[in-house]
Amino acid sequence: MRMRKKKNLDVRFAACADVMAFEPKEKRGKWRALFGNDNPIHLEIGCGKGRFAIGMAEQHPDVNFIAVEREEGALIMAAERCQQQPLPNLRFVSFDAAELREVFAPGEVDRIYLNFSDPWPPNRQRKRRLTWRAYLEVYDEILRQQGDLCFKTDNQRFFEWSLQEICQFGWLIQNISLDLHNSDFEGNVMTEYEEKFSAEGYRIYRLEARRRLPEDRKSVV
């Protein structure tokens, strides 16, 4: 279901200027300057209402977090939540994932989070899946050497498809969990969807995938 458009968005976003990053394409290659430090940059693509990004920024003050959400109705809720107690290491931004190359320079990002991305039907709309090879190629460009991707979902088929796609791309798969909430993984921060799905009895699947150097990738093809 598509979220209904919120009223007075321009005014509300302006009131959240302390936690927003407007005109993201102008910041390409300059994101660390925005934060005023050289700390690692972690990027969440599809942050929803911001629970995960805020929780991670609170837990890791030495990491800069950029939370992306194209649905402005959800993004304003995230920004207003954070605006109540702004975090210097977190910025929210609105753009489509297809524009990542225009927003981030090569090697500018240290880690990417994909949390409960839309599991578009694999036969008809697989190209819209954020773990599709074309997106992996983009991540491969904007991530630093040996940067990594963290992926969570409640959809087993989507998880298995993504695992295969990432393996075929040549990245190193690490820390797979087929039942995250009943594992020994520490430091998990839940999203709104994660809490809902877990309460309904769904398993949560998680993996980490590390970018390989080109010479290392040849050895596994």
Place the predicted regions along the sequence by residue.
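Conserved beta-strand signature within the Rossmann-like core of class I S-adenosyl-L-methionine
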Residues: 146-153
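Class I SAM-dependent methyltransferase "Motif I" SAM/SAH-binding loop
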Residues: 46-48
